[in-house]
UniProtKB/Swiss-Prot annotation:
GO terms for cellular component: HslUV protease complex. It comes from Burkholderia mallei (strain ATCC 23344). One of its GO terms (biological process) is proteolysis involved in protein catabolic process. The gene is clpX. GO terms for molecular function: ATP binding; ATP hydrolysis activity; ATP-dependent protein folding chaperone; protein dimerization activity; unfolded protein binding; zinc ion binding. This is ATP-dependent Clp protease ATP-binding subunit ClpX. Residues 3-56 form the ClpX-type ZB domain. The lineage of its organism: Bacteria, Pseudomonadati, Pseudomonadota, Betaproteobacteria, Burkholderiales. ATP binds at P122, T123, G124, S125, G126, K127, T128, L129.
Amino acid sequence: MADKKGSNSEKLLYCSFCGKSQHEVKKLIAGPSVFICDECIDLCNEIIRDEAAAAGVEASLSKSDLPSPQEIRDILDQYVIGQERAKKILAVAVYNHYKRLKHLDKKDDVELSKSNILLIGPTGSGKTLLAQTLARLLNVPFVIADATTLTEAGYVGEDVENIIQKLLQNCNYEVEKAQRGIVYIDEIDKISCKSDNPSITRDVSGEGVQQALLKLVEGTMASVPPQGGRKHPNQDFIQVDTTNILFICGGAFDGLEKVITDRTEKTGIGFGATVKSKQERDAGEVLREVEPEDLIKFGLIPELIGRLPVVATLGKLDEAALMKILVEPKNALVKQYQKLFAMERVELEIRPDALQAVARKAIRRKTGARGLRSIIEQALLDVMYELPTLKGVSKVIIDDNVIEGDGKPLLIYEDTPKVAGSN
């Protein structure tokens, strides 16, 4: 090894790669008739890391590592309760999408088109959780975008290419990785066309945004500013091809059931006509009959509907499903709060009647699974406030009276029970 400080040799040594002399670099490592400097070694390491990362993306999506639809469904079952048909549809769609990416480089007469996904279901039914779980399972970049914040380019608000910028941020601006990621666009129903009638005011967050999303979802070269930058004319942009990004759009689509019912249940005339009440069928059952024409009537443009060929509907969660959500998933709320209490060396017991009360309260509020945490948080607020300063508490018991606000949690001490908040 030679370095620039101790070089009194007659002949000056040079790096065989960059041509710098031993006086211009910190270290010069000798091989058989060749030399390499420390700067070239660092550059080689950087190239190897980048190539290894790109190879990792390819390897993670290879056929051998890609879980089967049944395996995807089994993993979704661990995190999402109910919605069996939606999980089955998603498992098949995601499997086919990444299987298609695996065979992109192979020459074939048949080209496989991308199948983006539309999730239709009420608030708190599990749409976002399903998309998050899929991304975590496949180890691909994932971003959630809110359609209500999007506007047409040139107006105040976020333009659609901001979605791709967030996706890049989530994978440290590795373009290859981002181009195989998953984008979940929430509240897609909120950008429906407001009316069939023309208006003098421009609908900058309705049809215009749908048109802008159309290109992104279909596949285009999105221009994204460099890290942390804003768009201005005289800068270089990062080009991201969205052709292989899987887009999952979700929305509650309030009022869509009426559109479907009006189409499917025609009123008969005469003695032989079948009279059927519109209230007989469950909303989830009605949504399963959704057709593209219903979505067009709701306010989505036909071109966007055509780019979302896979439609999965989620039903409203009933009391039994909400009770299961509280205790069964890997990250169940009850398990989370039990862990919080365990950090104080206290056991938390939430009785079945309390779970039932939480589920009923969420149904009354019409918040679905999303409202469960706030109900439990409210019920446990006082005891979580007092617990760190209380001595000798070994167990806290929650019943339905605590959830309904008619009672206090029962604190079990080493010797005698005591009610929280009592003197």
